[in-house]
Regions:
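Short beta-strand/loop segment at the start of cytosolic alpha/beta domains
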Residues: 1-15
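Thr-Gly-centered strand-to-loop micro-motif
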Residues: 15-16, 23
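General small-molecule cofactor/ligand-binding pocket signal
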Residues: 6, 99-101
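Short, flexible active-site-adjacent loop segments at beta-strand->alpha-helix junctions, enriched
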Residues: 18, 81, 104
Length: 126
């Protein structure tokens, strides 16, 4: 599986550098998600901009990541540009479950705003 991870203070970006997110890649991807979560990554941006095809195993990996970050931080799906990937997400109605943001830059802004909001809330509770 080809991918890159860009780690920052408030978020990490995992960019999948494969055409297909399928049953051959999904198990390794799930393992990487678990590793990043256990490493303490609070917000994960998952970039699918290179991906042209996702099967049910790929969707399962994405949903696994969403569950891992549900009560911990943010899991954001970005770069969902290919029509077949968009269609699969639409048919599966995952846009109502997942946080999907068009670009990496917008995803970073989203994480930044959420981080500021959390800091403000914790300041008012003290």
């Amino acid at each position: 599986m080809k991918y890159s991870v860009d780690k920052n203070e408030n978020y990490s970006i995992l960019q999948l550098e494969e055409d297909n997110l399928n049953s051959l890649i999904a198990p390794n991807l799930k393992s990487e998600f678990v590793f990043l979560r256990n490493e303490g990554v609070q917000n994960l941006i998952f970039d699918l901009s290179a991906v042209k095809y996702v099967d049910s195993s790929g969707l399962s990996a994405i949903l696994t990541a969403n569950r891992l970050w549900k009560d911990f931080g943010s899991f954001i799906l970005t770069g969902v540009a290919h029509p077949s990937v968009q269609k699969l997400i639409e048919i599966s109605r995952l846009e109502s479950i997942l946080t999907i943001i068009p670009t990496t830059a917008e995803s970073i802004e989203f994480v930044t705003m959420e981080t500021i909001e959390q800091e403000l809330q914790s300041d008012t509770e003290e």
